[in-house]
Amino acid sequence: KYLLTRSKCDFCQKPISYLQLVPIFNFIRSQGKSLCCNRQLSKSYIIGELLSYVSLIILNITTLPVNGAVLLLIYFSLLVLALYDIKTFSIPIHIPIIVIITSFILGSFYLLQGCFITMLLHLIFYCCKNCIGYGDILIFALLSFILPFSIFFLILWFTFLTGGCFSIFYIALKRSLKLKLPLVPFIFCAFIMVALFYPFLTWVVI
C-alpha cells in the first residue's frame, strides 16, 4: 500500500500529478512553488534533484571496487540523509536499516570489520558525547559494514578533514565558537571525493 501511495503537496496534501514529479523541470516551471496552493517549496528539492545526476558521473568514471548497485544505494541514501540532517540535525533510522539489509542481499557485507569498528565508534561516542551526534555514529557504523576498510577509512578521513576546515573557516568568519554543524553532508561530500579520486588517494591507507 505504501509503495502505491501518490505523492502529495507538502502544504495542502493534494495529490501531485505525474508531470509535477519530473525532476528539475517542474521546479523551474513552477518557479519553486507548489502549483496547487502557490506556496514556496523547500530548496532541498532542487538541490537533491541536481545532485542526483552526479551519481551518473560517479558510476561511469569511478574505480571503486564496489558493486554499482551498492554504490548508487550508498550515494542516494547519503544524499537524502544529508539534506534531512541539514534541516533537522537528525536522521530517520529506517533508511540505514533499509541500506544495510539491501547491501547484505547484494553481497556487500563485512560482518567482523563492521562489528569491530561499530564497537570502537560507540566507545568514542561515549567518551566524547559533545563532539559528535549519535546519528553520525550510526552512519559511520553502517558504512563500515558495507564498504571495504580502505574506502571506509578514506571517507572517515575526508569527512573530518572537510568538516574541520569548514569549522575553522566559519569560526574565523563569525568570530564565535558557538557552532553546531550537521556532519552527514560532510560524509556525503567525502564519499563523492573518494568515489571520484580513489586511484589518487590509495597512498593514504598504504
Model-predicted regions and their roles:
Residues 39, 153-157, 185:
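Internal alpha-helical transmembrane segments of multi-pass membrane proteins, especially GPCRs
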Residues 52-56, 117, 121, 162-166, ...:
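Alpha-helical transmembrane segments of multipass membrane proteins
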Residues 62, 169-173, 200-201:
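Juxtamembrane "helix-exit" motif on the non-cytosolic side of transmembrane helices
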Residues 1-44:
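Membrane-proximal soluble regions of multi-pass membrane proteins
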Residues 34-102:
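Long, charge-rich boundary regions
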